[in-house]
UniProtKB/Swiss-Prot annotation:
GO cellular component entries: cytoplasm; excinuclease repair complex
HAMAP family: UvrC
Record InterPro entries: GIY-YIG_endonuc (IPR000305), GIY-YIG_endonuc_sf (IPR035901), GIY-YIG_UvrC_Cho (IPR047296), RuvA_2-like (IPR010994), UVR_dom (IPR001943), UVR_dom_sf (IPR036876), UvrABC_protein_C (IPR050066), UvrC (IPR004791)
Region span, Disordered: 647-669
CDD domains named in the record: GIY-YIG_UvrC_Cho
GO MF assignments: DNA binding; excinuclease ABC activity
Protein name in the entry: UvrABC system protein C
Length: 669
């Protein structure tokens, strides 16, 4: 805990509000709310916590807070701040799950489409459907019944669907707008569950066609009626009232929360949404935050009813749902409370305070929270069922949340057990104590340019990225893998001895006998007795065998074993890490080398160009004016363009290596 945090902890008020934790870069990494700011914020820095909270606290370098008038106001403000800053430790809903909807467009002659995103475009949406197949099945059925427009608005002749009676082509053929409007209304009624009227009409048409001996047409009507019946049976009816509702259940265990949402449409359970995430506050409060974010997403359409468990505060749910749906999470009442009570210490600067206050002023112009809340709740009811089928639905959602969370833990425990067992078995196979900490090294260079090395660390079979290290080769000229490895290992373990930091239980070299022998020589010179193994690759650049012992021998390992899989992961990871570092360094060197010597272009201006254009090719394609706009004088921009357009001695070498030649052996090793 630094001095800034210590000073601010003494100034915390006893009021409700929101707090923002920041890292060393001033980035907001967590937003929380509290009924009592003093008690909540201080609790982070006192007492014991679980691993996740300890990790969060270890990154906190500064904090801020905003005082509000009530706990509900802090809840709504918290959601607003999370959406604004997107802190890495907060609950953030996944944005990659877009369920399909049927959309009736807001056009003169509407179309029926299957879409994945709900937009505020005046169209009417129905769904969500379990998958695209289900949505397309309903659309195909409706296409057979209603000849909705499928062609564009600028067609000059009828489309293909016109000839098979699935499009009226209203742009080419005159269609009475009222007729089209009535048809659109029938489609909407069908999609809201009122299909009895349509079935009755189809039955009448089928009988009429049969009486007129139009047997093919009668068969078509029969098939459509049958398809409607099949569609009904595919959807499980949960309630006879045919209302749209979302059913929420949640479960918490071991610092994790799982929220399960059932989508019930026209009384049928059609889909569910599952989210699991670590939580740091009170479980009920984090669940409320989840609901607030859930309904901010346009793809989560507001149903007629929302079912929630009995242990959740109903008033809070009503507040966050209302605010989320309006797209404006700070109400007028909140704005006044925040504006009047924002804490600003004279001796401490809050970098985001001005931004927060400006947002509040802007939002203060909106409608009052009371009016917005009553308007929303006139359409949507928040219900806490206490018995019957509705209570069973909430219980089912809660039970499913528990099952999903337990499944996550079971899978994780099996993976941990499997990985730990592989580490233990590897030690037995090599005849050494269990290698809890394994370190691996690899070099990377092209023709001796930008030579680098990298070290990765695996602890209990899992990568420990905080212990990874990158090395620029300092004493070796040209492409000498052995000399580079000697330098890097000497630097690594000399420093470890000097600083008395952790040493590995096993060193796994990316390479064969040559790399292993270099490692052994370095360790011998430093007086270290650490086992060294070599991970040798075949001609396809894949892990093929493990070398160990004195003299080195191939260790018999099944390619299907967990031990072999662990070694492959280590070798792939150290190679990836080294290659990535080398490419980053090579790109910077290439960029600088071509711009070196240009009068008026120093390091700062080079950095401006790199930030704006990312690479040399982008600068070459830019105009002189665009280069100047990146932050360099016009005459310097001209010199840059002239230099890049002239032949450069290293161009052929660099570009042929970078773009036209596959990875060379020295980069693969």
């Amino acid at each position: 805990m630094n001095q800034t945090i210590k000073a601010k902890l003494e100034l915390l008020p006893d009021s409700p509000g929101c707090y923002l934790h920041k890292d060393k870069n001033g980035t907001v990494i967590y937003v929380g709310k509290a009924k009592n700011l003093k008690n909540r914020v201080r609790s982070y820095f006192h007492g014991s916590h679980n691993t996740k909270t300890e990790l969060l606290v270890s990154e906190i370098e500064d904090l801020e807070w905003i005082v509000v008038g009530s706990n509900i106001e802090s809840l709504v403000l918290e959601i607003n701040l999370i959406q604004r800053y997107k802190p890495k430790y907060n609950i953030m809903l996944k944005d990659d799950k877009y369920y399909p909807f049927l959309k009736i467009t807001n056009e003169k002659y509407p179309r029926l489409l299957v879409v994945r995103k709900v937009q505020k475009d005046g169209a009417t949406y129905f769904g969500p459907y379990p998958d695209v197949k289900a949505a397309n099945e309903v659309k195909r059925l409706l296409d057979r019944i209603f000849p909705f427009r499928k062609c564009g608005l600028h067609e000059k002749k009828v489309c293909f669907y016109f000839h098979i009676h699935q499009c009226l082509c209203p742009v080419v053929n005159h269609v009475d707008p009222q007729v089209y409007k009535d048809m659109t209304q029938e489609v909407k009624e069908f999609l809201t569950g009122s299909d009895k009227k349509i079935v009755k009409e189809l039955e009448g048409k089928m009988i009429s066609a049969s009486d007129n001996m139009e047997f093919e047409q009668a068969a078509e009507y029969r098939d459509v009626i049958k398809a409607i019946g099949t569609l009904r049976t595919k959807q499980r009816v949960m309630n006879q009232d045919l209302k749209d509702r979302d059913v929420f259940g949640y479960y918490v265990d071991k610092g994790w929360m799982c929220v399960q949402v059932f989508f019930v449409r026209q009384g049928k359970l059609i889909q569910r949404d599952v989210n699991m995430f670590p939580y740091y506050n009170d479980a009920e409060e984090d669940f409320l935050t989840y609901i607030g974010q859930f309904y901010q997403d346009n793809n989560h359409m507001m149903p007629r009813e929302i079912f929630i468990p009995q242990d959740i505060d109903k008033d809070s749910v009503e507040a966050v749902v209302a605010a989320s749906q309006e797209g404006n999470l700070l109400t007028k009442a909140q704005a006044k409370a925040v504006d009047a009570k924002v804490f600003t210490a004279k001796t401490l600067k809050f970098s985001d305070q001005k931004d927060v206050e400006q947002s509040i002023v802007k939002l203060d112009k909106e409608l009052s929270s009371e009016k917005r809340l009553s308007s929303l709740l006139a359409k949507t009811q928040i219900i806490q069922p206490s018995r019957g089928e509705k209570k069973q639905l909430v219980n089912m959602a809660t039970k499913n949340a528990q099952t999903q969370l337990q499944l996550k833990f079971d899978v994780a425990e099996r993976d941990i057990l499997k990985t730990t067992k592989a580490v233990e078995n590897l030690g037995k196979i090599l005849g050494i104590p269990k290698p809890v900490r394994i370190e691996s090294f690899d070099n990377s260079n092209i023709m001796g340019t930008s030579p680098v090395s990298a070290m990765v660390v695996f602890i209990d079979g899992k990568p420990s990225k905080k212990d990874y290290r990158k090395y620029k080769i300092k004493t070796v000229v040209g492409a000498d893998d052995y000399a580079s490895m000697r330098e890097v290992m000497t630097r690594r373990y000399s420093r470890a001895l000097k600083e008395e930091t952790a040493l590995p239980d096993l060193i796994a070299m990316d390479g064969g006998a040559g790399q292993v022998n270099i490692a052994k020589e370095v360790l011998r010179e430093l007086g270290l007795a650490i086992p060294v193994a070599g991970m040798q690759k075949n001609d396809k650049h894949q892990t093929s065998e493990l070398l160990f012992g004195d003299p080195l021998e191939v260790v018999p390992l099944s390619r299907q074993s967990q031990e072999f899989f662990l070694l492959t992961r280590i070798q792939d990871e150290v190679h990836r890490f080294a290659i990535t570092f080398h490419r980053q360094l090579r790109g910077k060197n290439t960029f600088s080398s071509k711009l070196d010597g240009i009068v008026g272009l120093g390091p700062k201006r080079k950095q401006k160009l790199l930030t704006t254009f990312k690479n040399l090719k982008a600068i070459e394609e830019a105009t002189v004016q665009e280069v100047a706009e990146a932050g360099v004088p016009y005459e310097v921009a001209e010199r840059v363009k002239n230099t890049l357009s002239a032949p450069h001695k290293s161009d052929e070498n660099w570009e042929s290596i970078k773009d036209n030649v596959p990875l060379l052996k020295s980069e693969k090793s």
